[in-house]
C-alpha cells in the first residue's frame, strides 16, 4: 500500500498517523476541514452500515457506533426516526444516507452539529444550506466499494489478520 496522506494526528493528539491505500478514490470531499484519523474510521463504518439498506435510510454514528438508524419512504422521515432514538448522541457525529440529500433534509439536519455528512450526492440547494457551516465535512460516496474493501485487516503482535467481511 502507498501512503495517501499524513494525518495531523492519530486517534489521540499525541499519536502520529498516516492513511495508506485508495480511500480518496472512494470519496470526494466537497467542503469542510481536513479529515481526521477518527473521521476516516467513522466514515468507513458508516459506509459499510448504509450499504446494508435499499430503502431511503439515515444512520447516525459516533465513534463507529450507530446511535440511530432508520429507513422510510424518504430521508426526512427516516431522519426523524433515527434522531428520535437518541437526541443527544448525534451531536458531533457522522450522518450517512443512501439517497441524494435535498433542501428539506439539509434544513432539518443543519440544526444540529455534525462532523461529517456522507451521501451519494447533494442538490445545489442542500449545498447552499450546508455551505454556511464551513467546518462541516461533506463527502460524496463514489459508488460501490473496491473489492479490497470487502476484507478486514487487524494488526496483531508480530503480524496481521485478514478475513472476508461478514456481509
State what each model feature region is:
Residues 1-167:
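ATP-dependent carboxylate/acyl-activation modules
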Amino acid at each position: 500500500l502507498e501512503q495517501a496522506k499524513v494525518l495531523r494526528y492519530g486517534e489521540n493528539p499525541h499519536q502520529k498517523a498516516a492513511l495508506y491505500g485508495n480511500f480518496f478514490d472512494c470519496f470526494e470531499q466537497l467542503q469542510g476541514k481536513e479529515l481526521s484519523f477518527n473521521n476516516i474510521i467513522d466514515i468507513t463504518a458508516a459506509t459499510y452500515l448504509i450499504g446494508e439498506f435499499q430503502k431511503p435510510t439515515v444512520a447516525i454514528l459516533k465513534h463507529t457506533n450507530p446511535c440511530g438508524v432508520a429507513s422510510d419512504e424518504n430521508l426526512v422521515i427516516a431522519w426523524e426516526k433515527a434522531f428520535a432514538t437518541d437526541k443527544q448522541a448525534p451531536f458531533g457525529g457522522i450522518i450517512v444516507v443512501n439517497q441524494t440529500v435535498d433542501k428539506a433534509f439539509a434544513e432539518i439536519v443543519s440544526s444540529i452539529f455534525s462532523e461529517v455528512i456522507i451521501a451519494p450526492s447533494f442538490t445545489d440547494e442542500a449545498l447552499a444550506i450546508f455551505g454556511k457551516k464551513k467546518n462541516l465535512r461533506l463527502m460524496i460516496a463514489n459508488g460501490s466499494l473496491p473489492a479490497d474493501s470487502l476484507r478486514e485487516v487487524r494488526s496483531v503482535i508480530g503480524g496481521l489478520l485478514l478475513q472476508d467481511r461478514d456481509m
